[in-house]
């Protein structure tokens, strides 16, 4: 290996990361609104929930592909949506084969299914597609690269009502 090749590696020119978007939920709590339409593709202003997420992540140089894992019921809708998009990174839709909320795989199994199906060995950014976010993932990706280990993003939520509807972690004083 030449010195210039080592410098390229040091500058992360060979570093790649896949963005895996978990979009296989059935959003049953939203009733008729999402009975036959995926929650991540609901309109928010001039975009969609998923569109807002990808607009941000697509700008991260280290990301080389967006992998969207969805269910069989909504896969054709995601495929059609993808054809209308103009992101700089490739978008791959993965159908997890489930057709009902009762047969869903769950987020972790969907992630494992996508990793196995595409034989992904790169670092990954895993994002839930059903959350409206108001921040950029760029700093988080830089942080994860600098730590060279698994990183989990979380935020403090003071509302007990909101905490009762979501996953909760408990941390000690050593959390960084």
Positions of predicted regions on the chain:
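N-terminal amphipathic/basic-hydrophobic helices that include classical n-h-c signal peptides
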Residues: 1-16
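Compositionally biased amphipathic helical and low-complexity segments enriched in hydrophobic
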Residues: 5-8, 34, 116
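Low-complexity, intrinsically disordered/propeptide-like segments
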Residues: 9-10, 57, 121
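N-terminal glycine-rich phosphate-binding loop and ensuing alpha1 helix
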Residues: 14-77
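Conserved beta-loop-beta/alpha segment of the NTase-like Rossmann-fold superfamily
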Residues: 76-173
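Conserved FAD/dinucleotide-binding core of flavoprotein oxidoreductases
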Residues: 176
